[in-house]
Amino acid sequence: MAFTLTNKNVIFVAGLGGIGLDTSKELLKRDLKNLVILDRIENPAAIAELKAINPKVTVTFYPYDVTVPIAETTKLLKTIFAKLKTVDVLINGAGILDDHQIERTIAVNYTGLVNTTTAILDFWDKRKGGPGGIICNIGSVTGFNAIYQVPVYSGTKAAVVNFTSSLAKLAPITGVTAYTVNPGITRTTLVHKFNSWLDVEPQVAEKLLAHPTQPSLACAENFVKAIELNQNGAIWKLDLGTLEAIQWTKHWDSGI
């Protein structure tokens, strides 16, 4: 079902990162009511740039580390919901590309995303009288087919795809729909910092960037298109400037 972003309230976790910042800029062109950015590091210059793009949109920043306990996330969300009354979309975009830091990669890329999602269900779940909502989780094409030299990062992104697909199937119960956007290799500062697990490929970043990539802006444009298409359960591939819905092959069914 097509979705208009006009006059909507959006929370964007990691909305100041490489792809995140360009996506925030694209979102502002859609005349949101509020864009709430949650990020670990405050960037006043970036916030000022965003506010200047569309003065009609209220841009607010809160410091947020996705690795905090759920109780802290819930406390922050209470503050946001008290101010805005309603939130329409949550974008979970926090991610690191560092297979040297195993625990932190899992905590940021997967556990933090799950915890942030779990926390917002307190406010959205229709079983608790909530209005429902839309969750957009940022995965990666490595969630489909791993970059085997970075198995920790790739594994977290596969987990994001499966978690989000489960959320989508739970929508009749919770009232919350969900989908993933999965960028291909995108030219950001993060990619240059890519390193491999146990240094199995010391030049993994250089080798990846030797292949065709996409600019962050092209990815951001398709990112917002995916949000507007609003297909519950969709697995979007954002690669080389294109937007494509992936058809996931079913090899097993739980039967429940």
Curated annotation (Swiss-Prot):
GO terms for molecular function: alcohol dehydrogenase (NAD+) activity; aldehyde dehydrogenase (NAD+) activity; protein homodimerization activity. It is an enzyme of class 1 (oxidoreductase). GO terms for cellular component: cytosol. Its EC number is 1.1.1.1. Substrate binds at residue 140. It comes from the Eukaryota. PANTHER family: ALCOHOL DEHYDROGENASE. This is Alcohol dehydrogenase. The lineage of its organism: Eukaryota, Metazoa, Ecdysozoa, Arthropoda, Hexapoda.
